[in-house]
Amino acid sequence: MRRRLSLTAALVLLLSLLCACAAQHAQEMDENGYELYFLSDPNSAGGGDAIRAQEKRLVLDGAMETEDCVRALLEALLAGPDEPSLSSPIPEGTALKSLKVSGRRAQIDLSAQYARLTGIDLSLADYCITLTLTQLPNVNAVSITA
């Protein structure tokens, strides 16, 4: 009985710490702050993570259509990172050809430069785009073609 009570108390403590951390992170980002995901420099101190977020303030009006919000985030992502320790997984010159939001899925068609990506490079680029776009409340899936 004591062990079960101790385990329950530890679990409650862990969950409250996680909730506090999430609330603090949400509070730190202002209402126009979004995270754009890029490749991190493998030689930078700390190492370990292949992808890291860069906070970007974008003016996305609450009345904007989801498609316009997706377009704004994609354009910021295609422009590349501001931080020198980050690099874009998306080939230079890649452009957005078309965009459609259907339900909660964003369907993105990128230019031919993106189609040259293969293997892990393609996976990382897809992952950065997906992580960036699924921050929007009306997007929970992303389809990418080139």
Report residues per predicted region.
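Bimodal "functional hotspot" detector
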Residues: R3-A9, L15, C19-A146
